[in-house]
Amino acid sequence: MNETYDWLEQFSDLSMDNLATSGWTEDEAVSAWGEAQPSEPASFDSVKRKAKPILLRKPKKKKQTKRKKRKATPFFERPVIAVDTEYVESECGTYNRILSYQFAVLFEGKLSTIILFPESTKKSGRLALDKCLVQAIEKAMEDEVLDKWPTDIILCAHWLSADLFNFSQAFDQLKTHVKGLRKTVASLDDVYGLELDKVMSRRIDKEPLNVHDKSRNRHTLYITFYDTMLLSPNGSSLASVGELLKIPKVEIPEPYSISRMDEFLEAEPEKFAEYAITDSIISARHFERVSSFCQNTLSLNSVPFTIGGIAVKAFVNSLEDKRGYRGLFGFEKVTKEVWPSDRTKPLTITRDVPVTARMTLENFATQCYHGGRNESFIAGPTDIDTWRDYDVPSCYSAITLGLRELDYDQMYMTKDLKELFGDKCALAWVEFKFPEHTRFPSLAVRSEYGLIFPLSGETHCTGHELEVAYNQGAEITIKQAFVVPWKNDVRIFEPFMKWGRERRKSFVKGSFDEKLTKEMLNSCYGKLAQSLRPKNSFDIQAGYSKQLSPSTLTNPFFAAYTTGLARALLGEMLHNIPDDKVVVSVTTDGFLTNAELHEIDLKGPICQRFRELYHRIDPTGGEVLELKHQAKQLIGAKTRAQYTVIESEGFEPILAKGSVKVDPMVTDQSAYMVNKYLTRKPGDKVDGSYLTPNRMRFLEHKDLMLEKRSIYQNMEFDQKRQLLNPVMVDVKGRSHIALETKPHKSLDEMLFTRLRFDRWRKSHVLKDFDDWCSWQDRLVMAESTSHKNVRLKADETSDSLMARLFLRFYAHEHGGLSKKQVAAKELAEWMSDIGYPTKATAVRSAKQSILIEGAVPMTELTINLARLIVSKFPDFEVEILFNPESRSSLREALNAR
C-alpha cells in the first residue's frame, strides 16, 4: 500500500513556489549607480546617485497572518434542512423542467416548511441554492423554529444527486464541494468547501457559503451534505422510509402520475404542495432519527455518510484500544520528519502502514479472496413438489467472530494438505480433480462470467474449502500454501456483534432502529474486502474515474477467511443433500431444494465450525439452516433468476428477476416473470433504461434523467454447468423443457460452451426438444471442428456439414470414391433428392477446398446421412468423415440396421 503525504500540502501552504528566493539581481546592481553619459567622461560629482540596496540580504518576507480556527457548532446542535424538488421531463427530452423546490427546516424537534416556485420551468428560470436557503431559514425564524441565523447547517435529501443539481449554476458552484458515492452524492469533507484539486495540482482554500438575508445582512453558512438514501436500510425508497417513520407519503391522485406532475400542479396546487412538502419532511425526520440513533445509541460525535460508515464507527467504539485498533488489521505506525518552507523547525507526521510481513503475502491473500457462491443447478420448470428456500442465519456476521489478530511474522509455508485444515487462516494455490460423479464440487475458479465450480482445475482458496474438497474425495496438489497463525484468541468483532444483537432485541421487530441495526451489522464485514478487486468510481472534482480507496478495515487475509468459510459451508451442505433430492440454485448464503431440513446432514466439520461461531453471539440460537420461503412449483432460469409458478400458502412468492426490470405498477411480478419466460422469443427486447451516469452529468452538465434504451432479453441458462436429461414439464397449461445439470470438467470446457451458446441464443431460445436438438447439434459440431481447418456456416446443421465435406472427398476422389462412379450433375441431383439441395457447380468447385478428415460429429442426423451414403456408395469409407472417438459407435449404429 503506497502512503503519500499530499494531505500536508492542503493544510500547510507547502509548494515548490515557496522554495524560490527573491534577492538582488545583476540588473539591479548596474542600475543602482545611475547611467553614464557617453559624450564625455563623468565625474563622481556629476553622477546621480541612487539608494543602494544592502548586499547579501534578502528582503523581509511579509509575515503571514494565521487564520484563526473557527469554532464550529457541535454537530448535534445544528439545524437540519431537507430539500426536495419536483420536476418533469422537458418535451425535447434533454433536461428537466423544475416545478418546485421545497424545504423542511428541523431544529430541536420543531419543524418549518416552505415551497418555492421558479418563475419559469426552463433552465434559465431555476432558483439558486443560496437564495433558497435564505428564504427557508428566514421562514424558520418567522415560525420560531430558529431564534438566530445558524453558521453550521446540515443539508440533506433522499437521493441528493437528483435534487442538488436542479439549482441554478449548481455544477459550477457545487462540483468541487461534493463527491460521488454509491452513484449518489455526499460531502467530501466535514463541511461544504473545497479540497486539493487533483487535476490542477494546486491548493484551493476551503470557502464557506456567503449569503445575504432580506435586509442585505451578510451571513456565512458552513454546510454538510447528506444523502439520506445512503442512511436507509437496504437503500429503501422514500415511501418505505416514510412507512417506517409512520409518516405516509402522499399519494398522487388519478389520473395524474409522477411523469405528469405539471398537470397535477396546475389542477390541484394545494394537493401538489402537500405531496411535495411531505417528501422533504420525511427526509428531515429520517435524518433526525439516524442522528438520534448515532448520538444516543452509538455515542458517536457525528453522523457518518453511509450505514457502512456508521458500522465502522460503532465497531471502533466497541474496542478497548480505540486509537490503536488498526494494529489488529496488520498496520503499524510510522513517523517521518518533513520540513515545510514556512516553518522554522521540522514537522513530525505519523501514518498507519501495513507491517512488512503482511505486505509480503498481501497479493497472495487477495487472490484467495472471492465472492459468494451463486449457481443455478437446473434450467426450466420444476415438478410440482414442496420447494424450500433455506438460509444460513447471520452467515457473514457470525463468521467474522472467527477473526483474531494475525501473527504475520510467524506465517509459514507448508506442503502438508492436512496442515491447512481446521480453524486457521490458511491460504493455498492448488491443482484439484474431483471424482466424476461429484454433483457439487466445492472449489471455485474465477472466470469472466463469475465463479464456476468445475471438476478439475487450479485455484487460490482457503483451508476451509480444501477441507470440504478433501472430504468429497478430491485429488489435491499444493503448488503453494501458507498458514498465518492467530496471535491470540481474542475475537476482534465479538463485542460489536454481541452488542448489535442485544440492541436489535431491544427494538421492536421491523422498526426503523431494528432494521438500521441489522444492516449495520451485516455491512461491517463488507468493509474487509473494500477495494481488494479494482473498482472505479467517477471522481466529480477530478473529472475522471479512479479506483475506489480501501476502507480502514480492509484486510485481504480477513476477507479471504470470511468468504472462504461461507463458500465452504454452502459446499458442505450441498454435498450432504441426498442424491434423490433436487437442488434448484444456491445464492451466497442459502439454497432452494425439495429436501426437508432433517434430510440434510449438518454435522460436518465446517457446519460444526460455523455452529460454534454462530452460538457465540446467540447461545440459544437454533440450527445453522432455517426455512425462509416455500413454493410448490418454480422456474429456475439461470443464476439469480428464479420465479414462483405455484405459491405455497402462508409464504411470499420466491422471486429473483435476474436483472430484468419490471414496471413497479405490475402487482404480481412473479406471475409477470413466469409469463415473460414462457412466451419469450429470439430477439425479444426489454427495458434497459438507466439513469444519467455521473460522468456524463458532470462533464456535459446534464440533468439526472432516465436515459431510455431497449436491450436484448436474456433469460437463457448461463452455462456455468453442463445441461443434460431434457424432459417436457407442464407449466400453467404450457409445456416447457426442463433440464438437469452436471459440473463442467474444466474452466476451458465452460468457456468453450458459453461462447458458442451466446452466439446460438441470438437467433434461438431453449424452450422445447427441437430447440434442445438444435443447440446440442451446434455444440457437438463446434467440438468436432474446433481443431480442424473448417468454418461452420450460420445455422448449419451437423448433417449439412457432413454433406459439404463429403463433396470434397468425391471431388478429390479419396476414401473409395471415383468420378467414374457418378458424374457431378448426377451426384448433385441425388444429394438434392435426399434433402440436401446441391448444384453441379458446387460439386465441381469442391475440388478447390482441402480435404478434412474426422470433423463430423456423431448425431442422429449424421448417422442417417451416413446410411444413405453407404447405400449409394458402398465402397466409400464413411468413417473417415467422423472424429476418431465416435467411429466404433458409428459402426455399431450402421450395423444395427
Model-derived regions, located:
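Catalytic nucleotidyl-transfer cores of nucleotide-processing enzymes
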Residues: T228, N234-G235, N374-P534
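Acidic, Mg2+-coordinating catalytic module of metal-dependent nucleases/exonucleases
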Residues: L231, S237-S341, L570, D589
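A short acidic-Thr-Gly-centered motif at the start of a beta-strand
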Residues: R57-P79, E144-K148, K214-R216, T366-R388, ...
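Conserved DEDDh/DEDDy metal-dependent 3′-5′ exonuclease domain
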Residues: L111-S259, Y275-T278, I282
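C-terminal, non-catalytic extensions of nucleic-acid polymerases
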Residues: S291-A379, T438, G463-E467, T477-N576, ...
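Catalytic palm active-site di-aspartate
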Residues: D279, D389-S394, L521, D580-E596
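Gly/Thr-rich phosphate-binding beta-strand-loop-beta motif of the actin/hexokinase/Hsp70
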Residues: P74-L106
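N-terminal accessory regions of nucleic-acid-interacting proteins
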Residues: N2-I81, T85
